[in-house]
């Protein structure tokens, strides 16, 4: 059995997310599986590192699939890019060890979030950022971000779909940056609960708008109550930026 690692970019705007919903419908996983299955002549499943939600994008998603036959990497890449829709791109194909698993072997993930922070809308970025038309206090956001770095129980920053044995995750870095009309947030960690990144961003937006005190973050973490964060940042601004193994 041969195991192949795919590196994938996609514009998630028109898709229902990564995870196939029972058949090869309008999901990233479904589209790629359909083309791979046609290529190898049998139904083939791919395993993604991150099950991104509807509307979320990826700069470096990683997945793997297995094949009975040995495949030529550059031919696989060419075939997939020829038959996949043009908002999904395979940037690399590599044969890896048969025990490589895209989800379970990942050691760190990095997400980038883009906020368009001008009074006027940006028509070119409406599917690729969240528009906040009031000026954000980036200094306060940076102070709040410090409280989220480290190992914490992130129940308050998840939703009801997050039913993991442990809600503890470690955030390695959390940066807030300003650049040409945008406020960008980059977060790296060993793993993330469902909606955790979007709720972290939502909390930072609330802080930036003066709706939440930066010093309230430790109490929110401690309380473990999901209703403490009112803002769930829009999917459109979120990008899976990098995965480390």
Curated annotation (Swiss-Prot):
The keyword Isomerase applies. It is an enzyme of class 5 (isomerase). Substrate binds at residue 111. GO terms for molecular function: RNA binding; tRNA pseudouridine(38-40) synthase activity. The active site is at residue 53. Pfam families: PseudoU_synth_1. The keyword Iron-sulfur does not apply. Belongs to the tRNA pseudouridine synthase TruA family. Formation of pseudouridine at positions 38, 39 and 40 in the anticodon stem and loop of transfer RNAs. Homodimer. This is tRNA pseudouridine synthase A 2. It comes from Bacillus cereus (strain ATCC 10987 / NRS 248). The lineage of its organism: Bacteria, Bacillati, Bacillota, Bacilli, Bacillales.
